[in-house]
């Protein structure tokens, strides 16, 4: 989701350049409102599973006549794709792991570049200059009646919170997150997003404590 304002800013600065986003099918709706953006859905559980599946995916990407790749993940899968897509400009995000480690260990207090800034840096390294200081977003869609029924009227600000991550080291403790939510809900409606069954139970427990907090984990899709 954090890539959306970056891609929007890119398209505004380079309206003649077509972007193709490679992502999982469940995330494809996030990009539906962006100009000059198409989506290729990857299925890493079946068609594109394993090295052979990634090779199959690389052939699909070559057939789109892609001229350059901006890797905004820099994980094992994309490193393998980089190998299969040799000959095509392929620039990867610098996640700043050393800078982050230095910050949390107290070795430095230098502010870190945000993830969205790092996303933009990848495109700049490919020769596309643009700024993200004033991001724009796609126009909001009409909410489904099931959503308005679940959450009620949106008379004040709404804050979405997704406290969980794929790795425990990237997850803020649920007790501390509860404290954050308790403060946020005093002035804003808070909507909690989750993951699996265990995470959903924890979010529902938090939501039950506050009248202005709602858990939608497992209830809606994009």
Give the ranges of each region predicted by the language model:
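Catalytic machinery of carbohydrate-active enzymes
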Residues: 1-222
């Amino acid at each position: 989701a954090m890539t959306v304002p970056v891609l929007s800013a890119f398209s505004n600065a380079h309206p003649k350049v077509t972007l193709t986003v490679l992502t999982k099918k469940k995330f494809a709706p996030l990009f539906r409102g962006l100009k000059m953006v198409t989506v290729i859905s990857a299925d890493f559980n079946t068609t594109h599973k394993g090295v052979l599946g990634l090779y199959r995916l690389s052939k699909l990407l070559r057939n789109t006549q892609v001229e350059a790749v901006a890797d905004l993940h820099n994980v094992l899968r994309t490193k393998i794709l980089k190998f299969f897509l040799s000959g095509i400009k392929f620039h990867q995000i610098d996640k700043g792991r050393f800078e982050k480690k230095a910050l949390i260990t107290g070795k430095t207090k230098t502010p870190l570049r945000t993830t969205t800034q790092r996303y933009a840096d990848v495109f700049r390294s490919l020769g596309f200059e643009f700024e993200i200081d004033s991001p724009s977003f796609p126009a909001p869609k009409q909410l489904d009646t099931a959503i308005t029924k679940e959450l009620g009227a949106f008379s004040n600000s709404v804050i979405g919170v997704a406290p969980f991550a794929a790795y425990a080291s990237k997850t803020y403790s649920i007790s501390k997150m509860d404290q954050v939510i308790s403060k946020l809900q005093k002035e804003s409606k808070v909507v909690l997003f989750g993951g699996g069954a265990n995470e959903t139970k924890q979010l529902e427990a938090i939501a039950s404590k506050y009248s202005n907090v709602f858990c939608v984990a497992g209830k809606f899709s994009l």
